[in-house]
Amino acid sequence: MTILQRADQRLPTSMRPITFETKFYPYAEGSCMVSFGGTQVLCVATIEDNVPPHLRGKGKGWVTGEYSMLPRSSPDRIKRERDKIGGRTHEIQRLIGRVLRSVVNMDGWGERTIIVDC
């Protein structure tokens, strides 16, 4: 069995270094640049004073996520999704929202929505 050499010389069992830089973006209610070795993910949170129609009048909040790759986040430029998002992007957004809702208590902050852009 051949073991491939990683570009950064890590062993196959070694994790990439992980760092979090908070307050990365000055205009949002919250932001963080997360780095996993050479992979960087910018997450920005926005709070809006509304909820989806199915939650109106129930006093509960909502958390959702939006996702998009930057055009030069890969060796070849990725075209921006304009009018309609693709299936992969849609599924990643659904996954982000579901994961966030599974770990956030939405009962204590009224009818507000937190939108996390990644």
Across the structure, where does each feature detected by a protein language model lie?
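Short, Gly/Pro- and small/polar-rich lid/capping loops
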Residues: M1-P26
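A residue-level signal for beta-strand positions that form part of recognition/binding surfaces
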Residues: P17, W62, T113
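Generic structural motif
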Residues: I18-T22, I78, V116
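Glycine-rich, flexible beta-strand/loop modules in the N-terminal catalytic cores of phosphate-handling
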Residues: F24, C32-W109
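Hydrophobic, well-structured mid-protein blocks that either form specific transmembrane helices
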Residues: D107-C118
